[in-house]
Amino acid sequence: MVKNFFHIRRLKKILAKIKSFEKEMSSLSDLDLQKKTDEFKKRLADGENLDQLLPEAYAVVREVDKRILGLFPYDVQVMGAIVLHEGNIAEMATGEGKTLTATMPLYLNALSGQGAMLVTPNSYLALRDAKEMGPVYRFLGLTIETAVRADESKPLETKEKRRIYQADIIYTTNSALGFDYLIENLAENKKNQFLREFNYVIIDEIDSILLDSAQTPLIISGAPRVQSNFYDMMNTLVQTLYEDEDYCYDDEKNEVWLTQKGIRAAESFLGLNHLFSKENQELVRHLNLALRAHMVYKKDQDYVVRQSENEAEVVLLDRATGRLMELTRLQGGQHQAIEAKEHVKLTQETRAMASITYQNLFKLFRKLSGMTGTGKVVESEFLETYSMSVVKIPTNCPVIRRDYPDQIYQTLPEKVFASLDEVKHYHAKGNPLLIFTGSVEMSEIYSSLLLREGIAHNLLNANNVAREAQMIAESGQLGAVTVATSMAGRGTDIKLGPGVADLGGLVVIGTERMENHRIDLQIRGRSGRQGDPGISKFFISLEDDLLKKWGPDWIKNFYRDYSPEDFKNNPILLKQRRFKKLVSKAQKASEGNAKLSRRLTLEYAQSMKIQRELTYAERNRLLEDTNEMEEEINRVIEYVIKQVAYEQSFENRADFYRFILHHFSNRAERIPQEFDIHSPKEVSHLLQAIAEQELLAKKSYLKSDKLYSQFQRLAILKAIDENWVEQVDYLQQLKSALSGFHTSNKKPIVEYYQEAYDGFEYMKERMKHQIVKNLLMSELALNPKGEVVMYFP
């Protein structure tokens, strides 16, 4: 808090400078205010920097916000805006106006002409905020675009994306930006690229995107794999095994492994002598996937089974938000293993073509900043990973919400019935109620109980998100009852209806503590915005997932068989001190493990990051470089020929001839009888002659040097892309194989780095051979329009 005090004191000095321009700006005409943008751009060109422009620029935006929106940013919002410009995180409580705060740093950083972005967790918020704030930027002469559509089933065209990403200010989502970055780097020519260099970004709900979503990399999938028939077999095998006897599960690390007894049981089931021999690698991989499907991935917590008209499908859930992740599939066969577990039709397993984590995506920006209501508790991780401080901004009005102590019960039914009594009590008074649950299953249980009590309510979970923002916005009305999972409606203001403040405000009921304290704070923060009254209370049982997974062993002594009806009328509250500390200790253990997992994800992603940057840099060089490539191509051909001549052996002339037909030319003449296939010198001479002949034929056919250069680039590009896709897919498979299954005494991450490096070196070798094959074995033809069409092998 001492550090935050000095931050605030420094911010107030800058705030005073901004306020000193207030009278001047209010006296300007609209036209004079609009002219300020060109003035600022000229001052930048003359040598001033953004920090020097900040006081006056913020004063301009503040005045325009007032004239266009009728909203004059509070002092605390201006302080938050200063933090955002400095590349740090502004912690601002729910309802403090983060959307308006962002107008100031977005305008200032867009003045450089290099672009500024605001990234939100979902398209609804991006579209809403851009629509509401857009008039401010347009008034000031800046262009604003949204890189998402309301209908996500209709993707944006490349031409449209290029126009969008050239805008001064862009509102988008983290997933849309990530996929656009990956698509950009799969483009075959400059015409299909649309991004410019990443400059400045504000991430809304930054902790949700950079921390809670850190475990899920963005992946573009491509060509389907040959479908394995092992999924159902391994699902059946796992169902015959017993936990602790045949396999062990570490729920803290989410790791599962077979015991010696389990290995023997698997060998017996599969009719094998040695399960872990090299030829059984695929079986072991599928067994690992099946074990993880049953032990690590929980229905209605990690995924839901959604029924459509004809068939069911597995859709992943975001644990932090409770939202469906429609476009995301687990890689490496894990998704198919879960489908086998749930007995739904297996989807096609696809290859990963490109992948990036959110951490590495946002590190591509020159300057990164963010907003959240709950960043201070994880400031150390933001400092360590992103070198960003978290500054807690004071609220504009004092928070008068009443946060009651946790109500702890022994059993789950006691907790449910006690919380239901609380709901009935406040509902009878007319207070609006927002009831948060930790899973889809629990939200539906509460919904059923409320219906049984005759209490009308809205249910908001992953199975019902169409009206999410509207439901949350209306949840502050008199008598409203809303049941929601985790952090539904984050970013949507809840305004109290008439008469609600007199009753004590919105009542938030948490039906369990979540796996990190930030989500609990966010749940509480739904009530008591902008000085409104409010009430929050959590109900906990010793049987909650958090305590079962992270609590001490002694709480198991309190578990016993019972009938839920036993506790309906007389729930017993646990008041001893040791129970009070139980939850915070369990949360700290959970948060510590989550932090380690994120660090491990970053470590695994490091190999991919280095390899991706090297590969993309080479692709971009090819797309942008206009110089002749003859020397470079000749070096590659010479290298490949030398390798074939000196390192590859052929049984006879027919074997060597087959090699030539497959790799150098399908028009080559037969090998002369006197040719010595064991002479590297003769092999080199022959292959060099064939290569020169093929290249000369293609150059003659194309006639134009420009077309020939285009052909050369495309041949190299195809080789890079095909081999990079193989490498990305290999790294995904490798991580899946090493990260969750104990088969070796080595540290999995060390083994991964070594294998990943070896794989990359092998990829570069394959790539050179593929370049030669593409250059020599491709077919050229004219289409009916007279255009040259290139067919690569």
Swiss-Prot record:
Disruption phenotype: Loss of export of cell wall protein GspB; glycosylated GspB accumulates in the cytoplasm. It is a peripheral membrane protein. One of its GO terms (molecular function) is ATP binding. It is found in: Cell membrane; Cytoplasm. Its main location: membrane. GO terms for biological process: intracellular protein transmembrane transport; protein import; protein targeting; protein transport by the Sec complex. It catalyses: ATP + H2O + cellular proteinSide 1 = ADP + phosphate + cellular proteinSide 2. ATP binds at residues 77, 95-99, 493. PROSITE patterns: SECA_MOTOR_DEAD. GO terms for cellular component: cell envelope Sec protein transport complex; cytosol; plasma membrane. Its EC number is 7.4.2.8. Keywords: ATP-binding, Cell membrane, Cytoplasm, Membrane, Nucleotide-binding, Protein transport, Translocase, Translocation, Transport. HAMAP family: SecA. Part of the accessory SecA2/SecY2 system specifically required to export GspB, a serine-rich repeat cell wall protein encoded upstream in the same operon. NCBIfam families: PRK09200.1 (NF006630), secA2 (TIGR03714). Monomer and homodimer (Potential). Part of the accessory SecA2/SecY2 protein translocation apparatus required to export cell wall protein GspB. This is Protein translocase subunit SecA 2. It comes from Streptococcus gordonii.
